[in-house]
Amino acid sequence: MSLKWTSVFLLIQLSCYFSSGSCGKVLVWPTEYSHWINMKTILEELVQRGHEVTVLTSSASTLVNASKSSAIKLEVYPTSLTKNYLEDSLLKILDRWIYGVSKNTFWSYFSQLQELCWEYYDYSNKLCKDAVLNKKLMMKLQESKFDVILADALNPCGELLAELFNIPFLYSLRFSVGYTFEKNGGGFLFPPSYVPVVMSELSDQMIFMERIKNMIHMLYFDFWFQIYDLKKWDQFYSEVLGRPTTLFETMGKAEMWLIRTYWDFEFPRPFLPNVDFVGGLHCKPAKPLPKEMEEFVQSSGENGIVVFSLGSMISNMSEESANMIASALAQIPQKVLWRFDGKKPNTLGSNTRLYKWLPQNDLLGHPKTKAFITHGGTNGIYEAIYHGIPMVGIPLFADQHDNIAHMKAKGAALSVDIRTMSSRDLLNALKSVINDPVYKENVMKLSRIHHDQPMKPLDRAVFWIEFVMRHKGAKHLRVAAHNLTWIQYHSLDVIAFLLACVATVIFIITKFCLFCFRKLAKKGKKKKRD
């Protein structure tokens, strides 16, 4: 750690000692890539407020860099997985998800998706075991006496560490496939009549056939789809804790769920007291652009610019796709800044410049920006909402199709399919978004909603972490549903009892009526004989 950061860290610690004793120690179980961007924003704010933050990460981590100086502590544990192997494996999974998973039928798509999820969670399971079964590491962390754990729910293990150390924990999450973690671990409510199942690409305004589709999705995810090998994870948790338990039961002990969306993005739905929405917490005002980039932007004149990025995980694409996209971009009057790390397309127009990296937030906040071509990652969408920029979505994998579906439903975006789109499809979508004022009006409405909050998303996220530290948890916000079985939660036992009571009463009345009828019949026969 550099002398500068050492001094900063010591000053923070001293301020903590001389303050009212509100500084705490936070242990973090992160997830890579865009998830880390959100998590890091929260952690940096916690450090600014005087808290001691330690990130537990493996030696194979691709983004959490232990060599960079930072006030955030890194506790790196060894794993048999190498950084290159893990990164290559994850990129192969993504490549198969984008180009290999067939969408021809519902069953084939989600069956292939389940295989990819199992592959991913096999790596997660390995990393969790390497951490938890490292006795030296566990002893060191136990002696550190952390006050709280902040974990990304997408990567299980943070809740297991919290159980081992007997400390409260919070989750950060966008979503899990089929809302598996939210439903089974958090007890979230998703009425299928008006809440679209994630990845169904539906809105909350569903016609009858769409509600049927939504119900089929829900039943499939609830009773058939398994996001990971349940037995493997449940057995591992039971062995480590020394008692029968499940991953979902352990997840259910989370004090708070910090969901990385907000009502500018989400469709209205019920949620629990220990859930808060902190979407866009990483967004901030735009900074000045580098000189060369600013000159290029200014050269666009009244036509303005288009920002194009498919995110940090997709830096390359096929030559055919690149040429098709470049051909479309060459036909618009706007200047285009394209984040691209592949071979220069032959059809690249003079209005388009390629960059290996873009200051995306600063470009989206520039007054000359007219549109944003995006893969639909939550972070990028929130930057577009924050700055009020209409979008053309080219969703690739994970939540991106669903994210773009939300923006389309709110009238702030159009989408094209990377597998089937032509140059004309992209060109028409771009022209519509740029020239039709309704898209700008709709995204500005979302932007105003986003900015009109009683507390900024980042402040709200940090508040709940500090709240849990101050009160040693937030049990008063945890619904009793976590203590009920599936049968009790759905009141099936009560319904069965009431039905049994009704059936008993009907049975008794029927028997009584039959008894009376027989008596009367006997008397009638007796009178006839007499």
UniProtKB/Swiss-Prot annotation:
Location of the protein in the cell: Endoplasmic reticulum membrane
Pfam families per record: UDPGT
Domain of life: Eukaryota
CDD domains: GT1_Gtf-like (cd03784)
Gene Ontology annotations of biological process type: estrogen metabolic process; steroid metabolic process; xenobiotic metabolic process
Spans through the membrane: 495-515
Expression sites by tissue: Expressed in many tissues. Present in liver, prostate and testis.
Catalytic reaction(s) noted: glucuronate acceptor + UDP-alpha-D-glucuronate = acceptor beta-D-glucuronoside + UDP + H(+); 17alpha-estradiol + UDP-alpha-D-glucuronate = 17alpha-estradiol 3-O-(beta-D-glucuronate) + UDP + H(+); 16alpha,17alpha-estriol + UDP-alpha-D-glucuronate = 16alpha,17alpha-estriol 3-O-(beta-D-glucuronate) + UDP + H(+); 17beta-hydroxy-5alpha-androstan-3-one + UDP-alpha-D-glucuronate = 5alpha-dihydrotestosterone 17-O-(beta-D-glucuronate) + UDP + H(+)
N6-succinyllysine modified-residue sites: 136
Annotated Gene Ontology cellular component terms: endoplasmic reticulum membrane
Known EC number: 2.4.1.17
Topology versus the membrane: Single-pass membrane protein
Any GO molecular function: glucuronosyltransferase activity
Glycosylation positions in this chain: 65, 316, 483
Class in the EC hierarchy, top level: transferase
Primary location class: endoplasmic reticulum
Keywords of this entry: Endoplasmic reticulum, Glycoprotein, Glycosyltransferase, Lipid metabolism, Membrane, Signal, Steroid metabolism, Transferase, Transmembrane, Transmembrane helix
Family as reported in the entry's similarity comment: Belongs to the UDP-glycosyltransferase family.
Primary role: UDP-glucuronosyltransferase (UGT) that catalyzes phase II biotransformation reactions in which lipophilic substrates are conjugated with glucuronic acid to increase the metabolite's water solubility, thereby facilitating excretion into either the urine or bile. Essential for the elimination and detoxification of drugs, xenobiotics and endogenous compounds. Catalyzes the glucuronidation of endogenous steroid hormones such as androgens (testosterone, androsterone) and estrogens (estradiol, epiestradiol, estriol, catechol estrogens).
Protein's name according to its UniProt entry: UDP-glucuronosyltransferase 2B15
